[in-house]
From Swiss-Prot:
Protein name: Small ribosomal subunit protein uS11
Subunit structure, as described in the record: Part of the 30S ribosomal subunit. Interacts with proteins S7 and S18. Binds to IF-3.
UniProtKB keywords: Ribonucleoprotein, Ribosomal protein, RNA-binding, rRNA-binding
Family: Belongs to the universal ribosomal protein uS11 family.
Superkingdom classification of source: Bacteria
Disulfide cross-links: none
Family matches, as InterPro entries: Ribosomal_uS11 (IPR001971), Ribosomal_uS11_bac-type (IPR019981), Ribosomal_uS11_CS (IPR018102), Ribosomal_uS11_sf (IPR036967)
PANTHER family linked to this entry: 40S RIBOSOMAL PROTEIN S14/30S RIBOSOMAL PROTEIN S11 (PTHR11759)
Biological process terms in GO annotation: translation
Taxonomy of the source species: Bacteria, Pseudomonadati, Pseudomonadota, Betaproteobacteria, Burkholderiales
PROSITE patterns (alphabetical): RIBOSOMAL_S11 (PS00054)
């Protein structure tokens, strides 16, 4: 007799393994439309991530500093569960969620050891987008 599919699905679910990693890197990608926070270990393996859109903000509310703050809190709490205590923050992009995401991580009790801006700056590469006219 074949096993029921519900039973098989329940057996395949794996429990999250708690990694005891004390140091990590918070990658904050702040675009004009969204803010994505990924917290990794020193080797670059992702421990947790969150985005403004993933927290229920849609449309123009995704690109607010408050949405970035909420996303940082969600990613930070998940990283604390993994054992993170110290973070280096790497910020990429010109978006409005740059500063508020760093403040939110610090408010969670995570010690921020360094903040660096890794926004890619072209040496006159691709042509930029046309100016917006309203």
């Amino acid at each position: 007799m074949a096993k029921s599919p519900a039973n098989n699905a329940a057996q395949r679910v794996r429990k999250k393994v708690r990694k005891n990693i004390s140091d990590g890197i918070a990658h904050v990608h702040a675009s004009f439309n969204n803010t994505i926070i990924t917290i990794t270990d020193r080797q670059g393996n992702a421990l947790s991530w969150a985005s403004s859109g993933g927290q229920g903000f849609k449309g123009s509310r995704k690109s607010t500093p408050f949405a970035a703050q909420v996303a940082s809190e969600v990613a930070g709490r998940a990283a604390i569960e993994q054992g993170i205590k110290n973070l280096d923050v790497e910020i990429k992009g010109p978006g409005p969620g740059r500063e508020s995401s760093v403040r939110a991580l610090g408010a969670l009790g995570i010690r921020i050891t360094s903040i660096s801006d890794v926004t890619p700056v072209p040496h006159n590469g691709c042509r930029p987008q046309k100016r917006r006219r309203i």
